[in-house]
Structures are given as C-alpha cells and as structure tokens.
Amino acid sequence: GSIPCGESCVYIPCISAVLGCSCKNKVCYRN
C-alpha cells in the first residue's frame, strides 16, 4: 500500500499485480 510500482491503472489494471501490486488512486502500489 505505500511503495509505488511505477505503473498507472487509470485505463488498464496493474500488470505488476503479479508482483503483489494493487491499484490505489489510479496508481499501482505495493504493501
């Protein structure tokens, strides 16, 4: 929830979700 994964999720889901990232405020975060 606090580490940005350097990916946005405005139009498409987080590709980095496979690494444990999730969408938050249109940006992909981890932990």
UniProtKB/Swiss-Prot annotation:
Description of post-translational modifications: This is a cyclic peptide.
Entry keyword set: Disulfide bond, Plant defense
Cross-link (Cyclopeptide (Gly-Asn)): 1-31
Pfam families: Cyclotide
SUPFAM superfamilies named among the record's database cross-references: Cyclotides
GO biological process: defense response
Disulfide bonds: 5-21, 9-23, 14-28
Keyword Ion transport: no
Role of this protein: Probably participates in a plant defense mechanism.
Record comment regarding domains: The presence of a 'disulfide through disulfide knot' structurally defines this protein as a knottin.
Protein family: Belongs to the cyclotide family. Bracelet subfamily.
Name of the protein: Cyclotide mden-L
Native species: Melicytus dentatus (Tree violet)
Origin organism lineage: Eukaryota, Viridiplantae, Streptophyta, Embryophyta, Tracheophyta
